[in-house]
């Protein structure tokens, strides 16, 4: 597998300075996210701090949605009964041959292939 993708909750923890998230990100040379994750993070930020958060996320390699990711997300949505935005996030990792790092075990079961749950809070 190639360098992983990070889910929204891991990045929120990282932005909040949680040591577990800082340690997890430090394990990897490249940090990749879906445009959906970027959007979810900005949506949770007050307007006054969004510019700063965009700068903090700038080093992350951003993956835009395309037809392959959309088709894979539709399959995941139907097969696994997953929320559509979560299906897009997982599909972005899978289409790019990577795992998804998350601590969201409610939407991404730990036993699901391609999921890494590094810690819980």
Where are the regions that the model predicts?
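Short, well-structured N-terminal submotif of metal-dependent ribonuclease cores
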Residues: 1-33, 42-58
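Short active-site oxyanion
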Residues: 28-30, 58-61, 94-99
């Amino acid at each position: 597998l190639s360098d992983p993708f990070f889910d929204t909750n891991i990045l929120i923890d990282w932005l909040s300075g949680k040591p577990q998230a800082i340690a997890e990100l430090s394990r990897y040379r490249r940090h990749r996210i879906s445009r959906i994750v970027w959007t979810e993070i900005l949506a949770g930020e007050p307007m006054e701090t969004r510019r700063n958060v965009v700068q903090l996320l700038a080093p992350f390699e951003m993956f835009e949605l395309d037809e392959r990711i959309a088709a894979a997300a539709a399959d995941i949505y139907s097969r696994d009964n997953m929320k559509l935005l979560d299906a897009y996030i997982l599909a972005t990792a899978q289409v790019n041959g990577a795992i998804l790092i998350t601590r969201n075990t409610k939407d991404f079961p730990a036993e699901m292939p391609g999921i890494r749950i590094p810690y819980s809070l």
